[in-house]
Amino acid sequence: MDGFSQRTPQQALAALLDRYAPQRLLLIGERFPALEAFAQAHPHVQIAVASPGPLPGELAAQRFDLALLVDCLEHLPKRDGLQLLGGIRNLNASRVAVLADLSACGWQETDFFALALQASEKFQRDAQVLNLFTYDLHEYKQVPDWLNAKFWANPENFGKYWW
């Protein structure tokens, strides 16, 4: 991901919303035009909004189809941001998307990679560069084709003996 995307961040977020079509959405940060358009087109979607920081108890106890962090990490100390993002990824959502200005939040791409997020797109507007990182549990680790009884030392004994 060396070059900049031809799309705008709003277009990329709109495409993400269309692709995943979440029924329950968690937004950390401020609402944005692409989200408003999605909400109008899909009035049945439940959207929970929280400000940057620790999740309120009622949201922390819920699962969401998609979590979006937009204009969020720039307003948190890095340690708090890591805890928030890791907690959401582990406990609250199977899919996560983060739009961040790395120079404003003090993060590096490797910080996102360490949390198993992938660099999806990079956007530039004047001097500002925004990065979109995504995580999808369903695409994170595919089961290798060799991980089955056919390739075990004694596949005929699979399920027969316990030692």
Where are these regions (language model features)?
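A short SAM/SAH-binding and catalytic strip from SAM-dependent methyltransferases
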Residues: 64-79
